[in-house]
Amino acid sequence: AAGWFGLFNGKDLSGWMTFDPGAWSVVGSGELSGRGPRSYLFSPGSYRNFILQAETRLNAKGDSGIVLRAALETGAPKGYEVQLCNTGDDAQKTGSLYNFQKVTESAIADDQWSKQTVAVIGNRILIQVNGKLLVDYPDKESTYTEGYIAFQQHDQASQVNFKNVRIKPLPDDIAAALTGLEKVFPALAEKKKPAAPSKPN
């Protein structure tokens, strides 16, 4: 598809950055794997407006996340976190925009692949899981404006895998960036449909 490119070559961690190299590896048929204590894996480049897609898999009680517009820093990087947590202890479940908009029930089973599609355009963040739009959030504070994509490995008990990671950078111009967004997020097209005329009694 036009404008999309893979962020991960499926073979090694070329271009990716981490402060905890022992936590991340490539396994299976081109999967990024996070294990061990909390750590983050940062994308080769930084982005402002974009759509990101990735398939993710978590173990039972696992906890992970995808941080958007993340700062390249040790510890928990500043940024918008897309939560990945199916049966873990955290009350904010898969699809939440962490600490901004909560999803309290996960429809994703442990050890099953699910597809995350997320977009950040200006101060608007969209999160879609397996084709269902869960979050369309306007951050009035515009808290984070540009940064890296950071995959989180949350804790020793968690095991997270990512595959088919791809990104579509979007223009800085908001109107241009929003053009055609409903092709990726079909629920947006539903919102645009005019209401059906009411029948007279």
Can you name each region flagged by the protein language model?
Residues A1-N201:
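Carbohydrate-interacting regions of secretory-pathway proteins
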